[in-house]
From Swiss-Prot:
One of its GO terms (biological process) is smooth muscle contraction. Residues 1-83, 141-152, 220-237, 353-363 are extracellular. G-protein coupled receptor for 5-hydroxytryptamine (serotonin), a biogenic hormone that functions as a neurotransmitter, a hormone and a mitogen. Ligand binding causes a conformation change that triggers signaling via guanine nucleotide-binding proteins (G proteins) and modulates the activity of downstream effectors. HTR7 is coupled to G(s) G alpha proteins and mediates activation of adenylate cyclase activity. It is a multi-pass membrane protein. The lineage of its organism: Eukaryota, Metazoa, Chordata, Craniata, Vertebrata. This is 5-hydroxytryptamine receptor 7. Specificity for G(s) G alpha proteins is determined by the length of transmembrane regions 5 and 6 (TM5 and TM6). It holds the Pfam family 7tm_1. A lipid is attached at residue 401 (S-palmitoyl cysteine). Glycans are attached at residues 5, 66. Disulfide bonds join 155-231. Gene3D superfamilies: Rhodopsin 7-helix transmembrane proteins. Keywords: Cell membrane, Disulfide bond, G-protein coupled receptor, Glycoprotein, Lipoprotein, Membrane, Palmitate, Receptor, Transducer, Transmembrane, Transmembrane helix.
Length: 479
């Protein structure tokens, strides 16, 4: 029950003094009307202000000006800014350089201008766009503590470029995995259809689908979070599920399925990759004559050996191609998953955790996962160069400023590799076993040699294997 003063009115000032300002109100004059102190013009006001201003300042950061509670900022020191700026600049420059090498190599080297490499060029262009149009603005924003300084209009443009380029890179990786799978499982029919027009249609579809994800925020379905300090993609539940599913989860599922199919084909090929032994020679097919072994059915045996070697080379070629495709695609899928999975898991969960108005995730966590995803654009050119000898040779020539005769070098390198494969047996132990058996069973024959022998008296000459009865005689010695 509320207290009243002597005049019958509630003692509001006493309640304010005792409950709202219990510490400051001690020792102040009575604020009630009966106390004679004017609550407005009394001398307590300066004293109250001095007491309040003398209190310790809070240790937490002041809330931002916007009502949404966005705009968390980090104040870096000078050393931290130098270290972070150097790392981000290095990532950006290496991404630009690596993807420029890919584009220049495929466009200007005749041997690399193949339809299958058009997808690699599209991937390099998407990654290059990320490095040129996205990374610099994110770097500046991070160095000043997370505050967006480029305005409201450019925020929407920046988000559209970021989403489109990153999605195009991810979807191109997905299409490359499908291309590799079809090339392995349909080696006779797919290369016929794999022409420039088909590749151009696939690339155009990838970029159009990537652009479609950026359209909803621009046309009013889901507005981006955009004010004086924050530039964040829309946190609408429906748009978040749609964009993350199309940009990441569906392509990742397709890539994992393609890798599993190629890996299964490689395992199946390895299980069937039996190296047939050389035909056994039965005892009744060998005739010992004068200590020299002669082999029957020589023509049939040589034909069998030739067929076995051809079958061997074909099996090994298929097996190596499948193994290389499985290894390459496995590394690509692994790097892609490690780089982008944390970011998209966070992006999917953020609206359900923080709501649709802003982000409550610590800024350093968001930026770490974001730059980890951007790093995928950096490593893609080096992954393909590691597994492609022609790209490695072209990179080396371009970095050494040896621009002339690159096509001739690639042709010579390819011819040298083909000669090495032709001279080197695919399975040395198999060919050695066959050749050794042939040498042991059928030694090389030599023509007869004529010699003059001298004997006295008559005796049996073991070399000629006959009885010599004359003083001189020309004898033909057979092997």
């Amino acid at each position: 029950m509320m207290d009243v003063n002597s005049s019958g009115r509630p003692d509001l000032y006493g309640h304010l003094r005792s409950f709202l300002l219990p510490e400051v109100g001690r020792g102040l004059p009575d604020l009630s009307p009966d106390g004679g102190a004017d609550p407005v013009a009394g001398s307590w006001a300066p004293h109250l202000l001095s007491e309040v201003t003398a209190s310790p300042a809070p240790t937490w950061d002041a809330p931002p000006d916007n009502a949404s509670g966005c705009g968390e900022q980090i104040n870096y020191g000078r050393v931290e800014k130098v270290v972070i700026g150097s790392i981000l600049t290095l990532i950006t420059l290496l991404t630009i350089a690596g993807n420029c090498l890919v584009v220049i190599s495929v466009c200007f080297v005749k041997k690399l201008r193949q339809p299958s490499n058009y997808l690699i060029v599209s991937l390099a262009l998407a990654d290059l766009s990320v490095a040129v149009a996205v990374m610099p603005f994110v770097s500046v924003t991070d160095l000043i503590g997370g505050k967006w300084i480029f305005g409201h209009f450019f925020c929407n443009v920046f988000i559209a470029m970021d989403v489109m380029c990153c999605t195009a890179s991810i979807m191109t990786l997905c299409v490359i995995s499908i291309d590799r799978y079809l090339g392995i499982t349909r080696p006779l029919t797919y290369p016929v259809r794999q022409n420039g027009k088909c590749m151009a249609k696939m690339i155009l579809s990838v970029w159009l689908l990537s652009a479609s994800i950026t359209l909803p925020p621009l046309f009013g379905w889901a507005q981006n979070v955009n004010d004086d300090k924050v530039c964040l993609i829309s946190q609408d539940f429906g748009y978040t599920i749609y964009s993350t599913a199309v940009a990441f989860y569906i392509p990742m599922s397709v890539m994992l399925f393609m890798y599993y199919q190629i890996y299964k084909a490689a395992r199946k090929s390895a299980a069937k990759h039996k190296f047939p032994g050389f035909p056994r020679v039965e005892p009744d097919s060998v005739i010992a004559l004068n200590g020299i072994v002669k082999l029957q059915k020589e023509v049939e045996e040589c034909a069998n050996l030739s067929r076995l070697l051809k079958h061997e080379r074909k099996n090994i070629s298929i097996f190596k191609r499948e193994q290389k495709a499985a290894t390459t695609l496995g590394i690509i899928v692994g790097a892609f998953t490690v780089c982008w999975l944390p970011f998209f898991l966070l992006s999917t969960a953020r609206p359900f955790i923080c709501g649709t108005s802003c982000s409550c995730i610590p800024l350093w966590v968001e930026r770490t996962f974001l730059w980890l995803g951007y790093a995928n654009s950096l490593i893609n050119p080096f992954i393909y160069a590691f597994f492609n000898r022609d790209l490695r040779t072209t990179y080396r020539s371009l970095l050494q400023c040896q621009y002339r005769n690159i096509n001739r070098k690639l042709s010579a390198a390819g011819m040298h590799e083909a000669l090495k494969l032709a001279e080197r047996p695919e399975r040395p132990e198999f060919v050695l076993r066959a050749c050794t058996r042939r040498v042991l069973l059928r030694p090389e024959k030599r023509p007869p040699v004529s010699v003059w022998v001298l004997q006295s008296p008559d005796h049996h000459n073991w070399l000629a294997d006959k009885m010599l009865t004359t003083v001189e005689k020309k004898v033909m010695i057979h092997d």
